[in-house]
């Protein structure tokens, strides 16, 4: 629903957008990706699950906006790699934007999105530290992760 709603909003505002999500057949996905690469439309709406692997957009796309994201670090990292590659020209930018909805809960600002993003950032730091130090650390159990995300509720 989110992808379709955002797409319709963009189209209503004169922005040529197309969508790829789980129900889009493979042949159609491939055509939509090729059309995006060739500039036939301005915005490609998708999600990290759908285009997590084997799609390179780095030659034509340098901005990613995450309206929703999964709690899976691998999905996020693979998704970010769709528009960023080693060897990009000097001065080439790549930007990532992360929407975060905030709500008043018990007279306090709360954002599930911000909490999930923070946990993803923590997981990425732990992963990079493990690679740099060649030492694996104990990480949170799924139950502890849930407590970190939902503990304020």
Q: Language-model segments: which ranges?
A:
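Conserved helicase ATPase core of P-loop NTP-dependent helicases/translocases
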Residues: 4, 14-51
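A conserved SF2-helicase RecA2
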Residues: 71-153
